[in-house]
A protein has these predicted regions:
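Short, conserved non-catalytic motifs in the polymerase core
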Residues: 1-25, 51-57, 107, 112, ...
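Short, conserved micro-motifs composed of acidic
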Residues: 3-4, 66, 81-115
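Active-site palm subdomain of RNA-directed nucleic acid polymerases
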Residues: 6, 23-52
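Short, conserved catalytic/metal-binding micro-motifs enriched in Asp/Glu and His
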Residues: 18, 44-49, 75, 118-126, ...
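Catalytic palm subdomain of template-directed nucleic-acid polymerases
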Residues: 48-73
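Short, charged alpha-helical motifs in flexible N/C-terminal segments and linkers
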Residues: 72-83, 88-91, 111, 117, ...
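Basic, alpha-helical interaction scaffolds
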Residues: 107-177
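Family-specific functional microsites
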Residues: 311-430
């Protein structure tokens, strides 16, 4: 560089960094680290994990300490340095025990922890998922907090995309693994999504969850986790998973005997002694698969299978036209549509007003009265009818929801006219 040559140096160990081949060469370089080890080993990039399951604490100490000696010898031979101070151990036990195994790596005692993050999942020594869900909720609430501050400055479509891109993936990372979480943890996840849905749609807390999800086109997270487990089972059934995953499952019943049964394609269920094991990924996924109709199981592709299993009744085409309009007017339109607006009928139904009568007369101020009958808005009503004259006859459902029988441009024409009417009426607080 600039007529200056760098000095040559030899590389005694390791692989060059920054190249496409670097990760592959590194994997080849460390691939034999697990040879001759007495316990199960998992390698992922530059992370290594040892697993040992026994009924004897002394046996566990002997096996793992022997493995650490082999790893130390391997690292010395191949000039790869490990940091024993960063090595952690997590001890799972379904019995109350007062002591942990005594483990040493390069003459350094290994620290036992209550929680450890492994490939994005926080594992806890009591085998529950409270800590993991606490962490992902903390991350997700930060983004939802930002969404709340931008509720009236960003469009509905932008807020919807932020949630789907930056929040829901956090809430669903490896969710089939921790779906056996407590009811309280599952409820906390749903509360976060409900709040995000209210921010996106602009609806108030008086809106039912059924209307809220119908408005935004989402499903509950628990239903999505259930569907993801069923899709996971489809991959297992069709040998679309690695062998180490397939080995976790019991045989199908047609492999256990020679005679034909109606449920031959079912997986044999695990005999579960504890609720903890019963709610874990594999034992809880098998009954979901076995309950499916044979025609669904025999779908020719994963996409076809998903279309049959994961059909979302809330994901209606109208949700796209619900994105239309300036943010404030779009919110007012959505609130009228879902019965949580400042119309007196909605306020009365939500216990925020003593009566539901309109200020113009003794008629009840419903959405239909507001758009079609109230004498206070006769002039702007003529403008509404004039703009939508090509789509007459009008009705309240057409004004609030549009129609799947109309193309997008015609629905936009209706929504534009309705939102201009809302703006000109000056009926709602800004």
């Amino acid at each position: 560089m600039q007529s200056t040559e760098s000095k040559l140096q030899s590389v005694s160990a390791g692989v060059p960094q920054g190249s496409v081949l670097g990760p592959l060469l590194f994997l080849l370089y460390v691939n034999d680290i697990s040879d001759n080890l007495l316990s199960l080993t998992r390698l992922y990039a530059d992370d290594s994990s040892l697993f040992c399951s026994t009924t004897s604490l002394r046996d566990m100490e002997g096996i793992l300490n022997h493995n650490f000696q082999l790893i130390s010898a391997w690292s010395e031979r191949w000039l790869v340095n490990f940091n024993p101070n960063k090595t952690e151990a997590l001890f799972f036990c379904n019995k109350n025990t007062q002591s942990n195994p005594v483990l040493r790596f390069d003459n350094t005692p290994i620290n036992f922890v209550q929680h450890h993050k492994h490939l994005g999942l926080t594992l806890s020594n009591n085998c529950n998922w409270n800590k993991h869900i606490e962490i992902i909720l903390g991350s997700a609430w930060k983004v939802v907090g930002i969404m709340r501050k931008m509720k009236f400055s960003l469009s509905r479509q932008a807020l919807n995309q932020i949630y789907l891109s930056y929040v829901r993936p956090v809430l669903e990372y490896s969710s089939i693994v921790w779906d056996g979480c407590t009811v309280q943890s599952s409820h906390s996840l749903e509360l976060l999504q409900n709040e995000a849905a209210r921010i996106v749609t602009g609806l108030t807390r008086s809106t039912s969850l059924e209307n809220l999800y119908s408005e935004c086109g989402w499903e509950s997270l628990s239903i999505r986790r259930r569907n993801q487990k069923i899709c996971f089972m489809y991959k297992v059934y069709n040998n679309l998973v690695p062998s180490y995953v397939d080995d976790l499952f019991p045989h199908q019943r047609n492999l256990e005997h020679s005679y034909q049964l109606r449920n031959n394609d079912d997986f044999s269920s695990y005999r579960t002694r504890t609720t903890l094991f019963k709610k874990s990924c594999v034992p809880s996924s098998i009954p979901l698969w076995n309950s499916l109709d044979t025609n669904i199981r025999n779908s020719t592709s994963l996409s076809a299978f998903k279309n049959k299993v994961c059909s979302n009744p809330n994901k209606i085409s109208s949700s796209h036209r619900f994105f239309y309009g300036k943010r404030y007017l779009s919110i007012m339109h959505a609130r009228i549509r879902n019965g949580c607006s400042d119309l007196n009928f909605d306020l009365h139904n939500n216990h925020l007003r003593e009566n539901s009568y309109c200020a113009c007369s003794e008629n009840i101020e419903t959405a239909e009265h507001f758009f079609f009958r109230c004498i206070k808005y006769n002039t702007i009503r003529l403008v509404l009818f004039q703009k939508t004259r090509s789509l007459h006859p009008l009705n309240i459902n057409l004004l609030l929801y549009g129609s799947d029988n109309l193309n997008y441009n015609d629905n936009v024409l209706i929504f534009n006219a309705v939102q201009e009417f809302i703006k000109s009426s000056d009926r709602f607080k800004h």
